A protein has these predicted regions:
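C-terminal nucleotide
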Residues: 1-198, 212-268
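Conserved phosphate/anionic-ligand binding catalytic regions in large, soluble enzymes, centered on
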Residues: 199-209
Length: 268
């Protein structure tokens, strides 16, 4: 995203994308804002920890504000040494604010005023379970690798490979980025059982929708199975407070690749 780059890639013609709503609302205000903003802040903290370790090891001069700034091509060290530095900077255990301050050579107050306060209206409260910097780093780097692999899968028309990458992406969103919910996980699992090639949550998580890559000839069966297993069985049994109504088209719809925004000159 820095800078933003785009590239046109075609979906295989024999697959469709099914969008299924989990029926869990994902608010973007008040307490939920802490969770939404926590992840990018933890990513910036991970970048700062890596940069600090690089400066100690090789006098790395470049400014680092985000994980994308930790460009291996700019680091004058062998790949294995870079891996060791990152492993040293990002320990598996969650970090407290005091531990982060010590590693970065900063005061806790300084971190609260800067990294934990990305805007005048928001300050992240130190999470009770600690800052999960290694897990967030692993997710972001893994997603970047999956994007590159997805590009190659689309170029070769390999829908099955694309589906496997979607599955891996959801697992990372769940386990490392921590933005899934039991309902999203269930909907993804049931989507796979119903015939999708790959399924994942979409958007910022904590509710909302899932996307499923479905063979075109399987769309009708997929929709019937997911309607029955998730909307008519799982939700009434586990979350009866989430009303779905009686119309599958209100919570599931089929889509596919189409031409994007463009300019049409109507004057000859």
């Amino acid at each position: 995203f820095f800078p933003l780059r785009t590239r046109a890639l075609a979906l295989p013609p024999d697959v469709r994308v099914m969008i299924c709503h989990s029926c869990v609302r994902a608010p973007k205000s008040e307490a939920a804002m802490q969770e939404y903003n926590r992840r990018p802040i933890e990513c910036r903290l991970a970048a700062a920890l890596i940069a600090a370790e690089l400066r100690r090891r090789c006098a790395f001069p470049a400014a680092v504000e985000r994980l994308a700034d930790v460009d291996r091509s700019r680091i004058p060290l062998p790949a294995a040494e870079i891996d060791r530095i990152i492993a040293s900077a990002l320990t598996p255990a969650a970090q407290t604010l005091a531990q982060l301050a010590q590693k970065l050579g900063r005061s806790e107050a300084s971190l609260l005023e800067t990294e934990l306060s990305p805007s005048p209206r928001f300050r992240l409260q130190p999470p009770a379970d600690g800052f999960q910097v290694q897990r967030r780093y692993r997710h972001v780097v893994g997603e970047a690798e999956r994007v590159e692999k997805a590009t190659r899968a689309l170029e070769s028309g390999d829908a099955a490979a694309l589906g496997r990458l979607m599955d891996a992406s959801h697992a990372s969103c769940r386990d490392d980025y921590g933005i899934s919910t039991p309902e999203l996980d269930e909907l993804v699992a049931l989507g796979r059982e119903a015939g999708s090639l790959g399924s994942r949550l979409t958007g910022a998580g904590f509710g909302g929708c899932t996307v499923h890559l479905v063979p075109a000839e399987q769309v009708k069966v997929f929709k019937e199975r997911v309607w029955r297993s998730y909307y008519r069985t799982y939700l009434p049994g586990r979350r009866p407070d989430l009303a779905t109504g009686d119309d599958p088209d209100k919570v599931m719809f089929e889509t596919g690749a189409a031409a994007g925004a463009g300019f049409i000159d109507l004057i000859e």
